[in-house]
Amino acid sequence: MANKKIRVRYAPSPTGHLHIGNARTALFNYLFARHNKGTLVLRIEDADTERNVEGGAESQIENLHWLGIDWDEGPDIGGDYGPYKQSERKDIYQKYIDQLLEEGKAYYSFKTEEELEAQREEQRAMGIAPHYVYEYEGMTTDEIKQAQAEARAKGLKPVVRIHIPEGVTYEWDDIVKGHLSFESDTIGGDFVIQKRDGMPTYNFAVVIDDHLMEISHVLRGDDHISNTPKQLCVYEALGWEAPVFGHMTLIINSATGKKLSKRDESVLQFIEQYRELVSCQKPCSTSSSLLGWSPVGESEIFSKREFIKQFDPARLSKSPAAFDQKKLDWVNNQYMKTADRDELLDLALHNLQEAGLVEANPAPGKMEWVRQLVNMYANQMSYTKQIVDLSKIFFTEAKYLTDEEVEEIKKDEARPAIEEFKKQLDKLDNFTAKKIMGAIMATRRETGIKGRKLFMPIRIATTRSMVGPGIGEAMELMGKDTVMKHLDLTLKQLSEAGIE
């Protein structure tokens, strides 16, 4: 194996949206392949037809591309080891099923699901771990053939099970977990390798695929550890060398300390959700990569090239990786601050147009206005969709202040500051951020009010918010007429509250 070219695979099932955990698996395989100048294979594991979702494979491919992950072989681009969908490899699997049947390493099993469940219930009642019990125990070859013929005559469809040898230790040196081993009598007995509908089971198909596609390393989540001894059993039965395995820790919710559940709607954990927010793909890739992997140094912001250069599976954590939504938001925000402004403009404009705030084909003047708006809020955003809420004041009619805002400007000196500022703005012909800040300074000189007592009432009265971007830039984009309307409405509201 040491002399073989590095070939890894990401093999999703088309059963739903791309989860952050699966995205991490794809990223780690991608980084490992690129770091070692190897090959990344995309394989669609759609053998379980009952669980497949229509369009699921296409969705996986689209979201992987959005994350900036590309591959060298796959169902969309082909390659020398195809087909790359399990549903198109049924004849290949059948060849090896037949081989194991002929060699006596596998057999037809006719036990019904009802019989198997009754067997498991009995074992549980006896305090025994549920496992399959060989149904032909003590029978001769002729008796087995007769029993199978009778079952077929009744219309029963068989599965195919592989023999698990007794007293065998299945062990491997995991590049993440270290040395792992399982005794053959602890893995549930002879397991199914072909279902009643003729399709292979996961633990059989994955071995055939990995071997024939010459996969050198299998990097996957540690929920697959219990599958590995079963797969090693298939490798041994077929006389094949197994790849190197590396099992990455599962992801937990940092808030609860429990395994991240796909049903937990309080956490954004599907790549499609980030695409809908119109996040840049780089921070999603960064945050996914940092889940369970510690790079050299203190930096948490990397380019793709830096990630590829640094990636080493030896630095993968043996402890569960905590998914921290706030951390991901922070990483997104760091990228927003340095993102290409034209790219950011395109993304944010799309959000504003979707919300009906900007027309489909804005005139050059309006386009420049949107550019200034996006630049003004870039440092505050983690996702460009946030521009819709952040900039509402620029697209709505003047509204009354909230109770909290009124309480803030009911304090002494707020009204005099607002009245004087309105007078200073009245004098302005050139309504620019620089001139507006000059008007604020003039208000300070005329009233003697300064600091927070000056700036907070003016910010609230003009922008209808206690926080926000630079107040001069914000008012310039609003325009003088809108700002004056806000000031008039604020003074009216103060009068109604008895503040003169």
Curated annotation (Swiss-Prot):
<dbReference type="InterPro" id="IPR049940">
    <property type="entry name" value="GluQ/Sye"/>
</dbReference>
<dbReference type="InterPro" id="IPR020058">
    <property type="entry name" value="Glu/Gln-tRNA-synth_Ib_cat-dom"/>
</dbReference>
<dbReference type="InterPro" id="IPR008925">
    <property type="entry name" value="aa_tRNA-synth_I_cd-bd_sf"/>
</dbReference>
<feature type="short sequence motif" description="'HIGH' region">
    <location>
        <begin position="12"/>
        <end position="22"/>
    </location>
</feature>
<dbReference type="GO" id="GO:0004818">
    <property type="term" value="F:glutamate-tRNA ligase activity"/>
</dbReference>
<comment type="similarity">
    <text>Belongs to the class-I aminoacyl-tRNA synthetase family. Glutamate--tRNA ligase type 1 subfamily.</text>
</comment>
<protein>
    <recommendedName>
        <fullName>Glutamate--tRNA ligase</fullName>
        <ecNumber>6.1.1.17</ecNumber>
    </recommendedName>
</protein>
<dbReference type="InterPro" id="IPR001412">
    <property type="entry name" value="aa-tRNA-synth_I_CS"/>
</dbReference>
<dbReference type="InterPro" id="IPR000924">
    <property type="entry name" value="Glu/Gln-tRNA-synth"/>
</dbReference>
<keyword id="KW-0067">ATP-binding</keyword>
<dbReference type="Pfam" id="PF19269">
    <property type="entry name" value="Anticodon_2"/>
</dbReference>
<keyword id="KW-0436">Ligase</keyword>
<dbReference type="GO" id="GO:0005524">
    <property type="term" value="F:ATP binding"/>
</dbReference>
<comment type="subunit">
    <text>Monomer.</text>
</comment>
<comment type="function">
    <text>Catalyzes the attachment of glutamate to tRNA(Glu) in a two-step reaction: glutamate is first activated by ATP to form Glu-AMP and then transferred to the acceptor end of tRNA(Glu).</text>
</comment>
<dbReference type="Pfam" id="PF00749">
    <property type="entry name" value="tRNA-synt_1c"/>
</dbReference>
<dbReference type="InterPro" id="IPR045462">
    <property type="entry name" value="aa-tRNA-synth_I_cd-bd"/>
</dbReference>
<dbReference type="InterPro" id="IPR014729">
    <property type="entry name" value="Rossmann-like_a/b/a_fold"/>
</dbReference>
<feature type="short sequence motif" description="'KMSKS' region">
    <location>
        <begin position="259"/>
        <end position="263"/>
    </location>
</feature>
<dbReference type="InterPro" id="IPR020751">
    <property type="entry name" value="aa-tRNA-synth_I_codon-bd_sub2"/>
</dbReference>
<dbReference type="InterPro" id="IPR004527">
    <property type="entry name" value="Glu-tRNA-ligase_bac/mito"/>
</dbReference>
<dbReference type="GO" id="GO:0006424">
    <property type="term" value="P:glutamyl-tRNA aminoacylation"/>
</dbReference>
<keyword id="KW-0547">Nucleotide-binding</keyword>
<feature type="binding site">
    <location>
        <position position="262"/>
    </location>
    <ligand>
        <name>ATP</name>
    </ligand>
</feature>
<dbReference type="InterPro" id="IPR033910">
    <property type="entry name" value="GluRS_core"/>
</dbReference>
<keyword id="KW-0963">Cytoplasm</keyword>
<keyword id="KW-0648">Protein biosynthesis</keyword>
<dbReference type="GO" id="GO:0005829">
    <property type="term" value="C:cytosol"/>
</dbReference>
<dbReference type="GO" id="GO:0000049">
    <property type="term" value="F:tRNA binding"/>
</dbReference>
<keyword id="KW-0030">Aminoacyl-tRNA synthetase</keyword>
<dbReference type="GO" id="GO:0008270">
    <property type="term" value="F:zinc ion binding"/>
</dbReference>
